[in-house]
Amino acid sequence: MDNVWLVESSLAIGLALFAPLQTLAGGSEWTISKGVAKYVRIEGDRLIVDVPPGVSNVCAYAMRQIDLSDWVHCRLEAEVKCRGTRVVRDPRPARGVKLSLHYTDSQDGDRRYPAASAPEEGDFGWTNLQLAVSFGEVPVAASPKPQLVLGLQQTSGRLEFDLSSFRFRKAPPLFPQRDNDYQVKYPAAVAARGRMRGVMGRGVCRNTEQDIEDLKNYGANLVRLQMNGFASRKRKKAATLTDWNEWLERNLVHAEQVLGWLEKRDMQMVLDLHNPPLGGYGRSGDVFYVQEYADRFVEAWREIAKRFKGRKGIYGYDLMNEPSQSRRALPDCDYWNLQRRAAEAIRAIDPDVTIIFAANEANGPRAFAYLAALEMDNVIYQVHMYKPGGFTHQGANGAPRPAPGTERPYPDSARGVDKEKLRTWLKPVAEFQRRHNAKIYVGEFSACIYAPGAGQYLRDCISLFEEYGWDWTYHSFREALWWNVETVIDEATGKPVPNKNNDRFHALVDGFKGK
């Protein structure tokens, strides 16, 4: 058996049918750069990574090139066995044990680093790391060469990879296009409702009535209330469903309070279950793979529907935040069916409330190409817009601020990124809208405070949303500094200072007012 296509029936048998990775055309053996050779070595069929305590700035990798030039509408699946000792957990993104793929997205020029879930700290015995990466209709950029990566990123510990266990294949899409022709119908009040425009509120129960009053004065009429914070809490301690239930109750109490403030001002709320049992909807979570967590997710929405039934300020129930399912789930627990189950549970209690349904790939526009419409009325479909990510997220989420002269601008003529390119990226969403008579809600979009041209990017995004008739909420209001439109960077100190006289703030407030 070779390591190219396996028939779909083989998938039921699982990874045991993976063929060993052979030398690929245009590929090479595992290589170790000179800069990390003192931490990484190969002994027979073992890759040893040993980074001593106190060393935390090293990417101790072995890499292997792979030709992905003809990989379209398919998936890469890979696995390897690994064991470790004294691994130190670093809570910052992307640190830790690595089985990953490094490649460049040819659509936007962004570098991608998808990685397998892996033990985060301490000692662990032989563990099977599994990586799955989906590719769309456009081939991966050929340069720089895509690389498979094994190792330890920016933390210390000792790892042993069994290279003889490394398996790899090119597989069919996890979610082949299975669209239907269902035409969504909406109640008269929803169909005739004016445009809803607003922001994602503060996380971790930190919204205030003054926040809502200020948003009302700015012209907003919608707030996405994120019930979040549990994923970061889980990283700090071993968590249980009891912990999650207590967290949910605190968030629902806060949501009731915020909803009252909104209703008093004739504004509405998107209720967003940002953290499911017990963590996230992608690499950081198990809701698709642990039956108890999946069932609790559905039950939680049943409880929420009972609690908020009849509240006039509910715009809709936002079932999932940014599902990123890349491997097979339990039966009826994949991102689509789990949302279906939750929607059915809600409708059994409240037949009138609006459901907000999430696309895969972190609500990405591309995922609308294979998203099937739920055969249920009064469902709004949600997209998030952060393309190109190399522009929107430069300096965000703990990443260092780009050095002067290295920032990515918008528009970006060198990469062909402008308003029409944004339209191209959003095309699958617009096509889904037309095909199903579906309402679309942009739950998140943004550009970092450090991004040159961020204000123009927001204006162009909002212009497209308005053209298509989509409701939207900006990410986010008075939360992380890199998204806060009420601040600017003091170039003398490099620190944020309050100042509303900036392009991002004006773009957003003009958008609220339909300008």
Predicted features along the sequence, with ranges:
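Bacterial N-terminal signal peptides
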Residues: 8-20
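Extracellular and organelle-lumenal recognition/adhesion modules and their flexible linkers in secreted
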Residues: 21-183
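N-terminal carbohydrate-binding accessory modules
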Residues: 171-245, 432
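Aromatic-rich peripheral "rim/lid" segments of glycoside hydrolase catalytic domains that contact
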Residues: 176-179, 452-515
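Acidic-and-aromatic substrate-binding clefts and catalytic sites of carbohydrate-active enzymes
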Residues: 201-210, 230-233, 246-249, 295, ...
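Aromatic-lined substrate-binding rim segments of carbohydrate-active enzymes
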Residues: 210-278, 338-350, 457-465
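Surface-exposed, active-site-proximal loop segments in enzymatic domains
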Residues: 231-251, 277-293, 325-327, 484-492
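Active-site region of glycoside hydrolase catalytic domains
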Residues: 295-416, 423-447, 467-470
